[in-house]
């Protein structure tokens, strides 16, 4: 006689918005469209977005990822190269032109806006203070828009407290788009306290998607025994969501790339789990994690939606006449199962 074993109850607070933002969607679409328009291989400088599963899915379609342009073989110089969503220094397109490469720029339009804000400060004679994380590709790209010596990087409130500019009266700040909203507010407040004349950008540099995802996590996290963020360890916005969840009241918060990374032995007695995804994480991985919990718990989904996102960014003019198939669109939107490579080759 078979006796059914009841599963313990669990509520999953599913955040919305989560996952792909308009800039990520556009960048992935550019690579897919380039492959359809020009054929394989299409080269991509740096990971198009910080998610290995997106990268491996594009590699399966014929994309080749490189870190520098000199890695592109001479026999493939006529194939396009795509610049990642994070943006690049001015020296990169200059290098591409010198090498007679055809390039497509997939820089997020909101990152490009920060570039313009920084250049405007510099044109007006202000030394630019960039609030961001050293070594992040977006920060490297933004600093690379300006002449050497005209921009300084500040990461923390402590940095802002010891920063000493040459001219305290002619400063302007911009920020990396994927920072913690609350942390950045503290850094800005310290800079404004020390340098009352410092000029803000005309519009907030932190992007709408970063803000929206953090707001949803703040709403869902209080009282959660565990909060899971789907994202890559090199994804700035995903790591910030982990921090936001802890500050908002989650007892524990982790960053995972696949359900296979969840340590079920360490979870213990839980009743409420929060779940979100960084802006470069496909929705199909969120679904995978929900199914993993359903296999072990009697789950109830509780949606924590703060706003509906409707933003959409156009792809490059050269690609607008190319049509995507239904399968292409599923991949671009993060909903295709072929966005996920086999778990054994996930590189975790």
Curated annotation (Swiss-Prot):
Keywords: 4Fe-4S, Iron, Iron-sulfur, Isoprene biosynthesis, Metal-binding, Oxidoreductase. It is an enzyme of class 1 (oxidoreductase). One of its GO terms (biological process) is isopentenyl diphosphate biosynthetic process, methylerythritol 4-phosphate pathway. The active site is at 138 (proton donor). Isopentenyl diphosphate binds at residues 50, 86, 136, 235-237, 280. Catalyzes the conversion of 1-hydroxy-2-methyl-2-(E)-butenyl 4-diphosphate (HMBPP) into a mixture of isopentenyl diphosphate (IPP) and dimethylallyl diphosphate (DMAPP). Acts in the terminal step of the DOXP/MEP pathway for isoprenoid precursor biosynthesis. This is 4-hydroxy-3-methylbut-2-enyl diphosphate reductase. The gene is ispH.
